[in-house]
Amino acid sequence: MKHLSLLALAAVAPTTALAGVIDHQQVTFEKPPTHNQIEKFLIQLGPGESRWVTEEEKWALKLVGFYVLEGMNFFDITAESDQGFSVKSFEQTKVTYPSEIKYQKELAPLSKDLSKGNMRENLVKFTSFHTRYYKSETGVQSATWLLERVQQAIDDSGASKHGVKVEKFNHPWGQFSIIATIPGRSNKTVVVGAHQDSINLFLPSILAAPGADDDGSGTVTILEAFRVLLQSDAIREGKAANTVEFHWYSAEEAGLLGSQAIFSEYSKTGRDVKAMLQQDMTGYVEGTLRAGEVESVGVITDFVDPGLTEFIKLVIKGYCDIPFVLTKCGYACSDHASASRYGYPSAFVIESEFKRSNQKIHTTSDTIELLSFDHMLQHAKMTLGLAYELAFAEL
């Protein structure tokens, strides 16, 4: 696998370009050289570690980051440079989470309503778009279809009369993000997220990118949890203590662009986000099983909020039928990092230990046939449990 990946990398990224990406250096927010008129992007590879790269170098870095140097991810912070500012070091919001789960009785009938069939049907359609690349026409089409599915869940539950709504969050690149809001008795907000875009790193604007696992699986997992959560009268009618939002982000693959835009806006407007859970890749278990290990979900432990992560462990123990394994994914590895960047407590649960996760992502081979909907059901149970428990928690 690693040899094949290196050959593929060589096909899309010249050695000199790749070397430039890997040779990290700190830079100031100066404009990039313009003598050759090649568009440049400012990426952040770690705290205080940024550099200008071409788009080709961005994709080369993602290939290297996943296949060779695990955890080598980045934020694209070009917009900050264009606007002449940088994100300050936000003080992390301190939240005390419950020490136990309390709503097993209320959640038992709801959990039984979670449907593998719904997730499969939605994922079949979602992966039928040629690509969900954030700059593509089909990326807009897939987002439009997803928006309609979220609205259908609201309509079917009759929740709109109680103020439940879904809205576009527009971006300059075409594909929009999606935010569904279930109002509670306060503006304290619990966020569940997944990213809707996909990418084929070899030729992003041309080749197919079904993105079944990355992150079609997370997209339909939280969609199903959202649908079932609205079956709760108390949640639907706004009786929970806190507001709950479900987010489907655009342009995660390009440097967490969609989620950065949303949490930047939330920070500017003083939104009180008490917790954010990211679901990115929820369906692949073959790597774990081939290694002779027990099927489990992967709880990320680096660059996350420790208190929220501890509570998620309680949720998994209480609502899932499989255990968790602790694992790491590195800096800026998914959209939870954007929440954390702006001071909001965040966490991330993935399909397995990171080294056992799907190696077919970002290619034409990231297809449904590789996924387990039984495993995705476990992620849906966890998502539903977390959303319900924190909706009623005193945060």
Swiss-Prot record:
Q: Which N-terminal residues, if any, form the signal peptide?
A: 1-19
Q: Output the InterPro entries linked to this UniProt entry.
A: M28_fam, Peptidase_M28
Q: Which Pfam families match?
A: Peptidase_M28
| Primary location recorded for the protein, binned into one broad class | secreted
Annotated localization: Secreted
Q: Which GO terms describe its cellular component?
A: extracellular region
Please give the cofactor(s) recorded in the UniProt entry for this protein: Zn(2+)
Could you say which residues bind Zn(2+) 1 here? H195, D214, D280
Question: Disulfide connectivity?
Answer: C329-C333
UniProt-annotated glycosylation sites, renumbered to this chain: N187
Protein name (database record) = Leucine aminopeptidase 1
Provide the residue ranges of the propeptide in this protein: 20-95
Sorted alphabetically, the keyword list is: Aminopeptidase, Disulfide bond, Glycoprotein, Hydrolase, Metal-binding, Protease, Secreted, Signal, Zinc, Zymogen
What species does this protein belong to?
Uncinocarpus reesii (strain UAMH 1704)
Quaternary data: Monomer.
**GO terms of biological process kind:** proteolysis
Binding residues for Zn(2+) 2: D214, E253, H362
